[in-house]
């Protein structure tokens, strides 16, 4: 499961060959949590500021917890067929977090070794939130690589550089038939301070003093 990640620091980190339209205004968020907003690249429709988590309802109409993640092995099922054919997106991120029990919840940060952004594959829907129409997204997850496996049994689908445009190409009907995940050698992991366990903690120096903030 991926329910916490670090946003891009600045818009210029998005490759121009993926998006060359108007810049979107956003604030760096080192501890993105469900219902918060970040930039997203929308297949066939440019880019948008999007909400993390797709709202759902029980059959009786009562709200369910938002959909944060969607398993790649379930995307061919009926409820996700439309998303795969028409509603694919990419969430550019600096990295993502997972936890291990080490005398309490110990967070770890996964990112690319050279600091390039991770391009997380996602699906999206448009819905009304507090009177405002907004795109909302869920991050795709798959079997973890060898680095992530000791921390969690799933990991976000971080796309290889040469597969990002393919994922955003709605003319490509079966992108999941290809190897999409970024190579294991690209990833690095390091522990974070436990202050970030609090979703309200947005001060990067409080849990990652060695990182360079935007």
Please give the residue ranges for each predicted region.
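Short linear sequence motif anchored by a di-proline
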Residues: 1-214
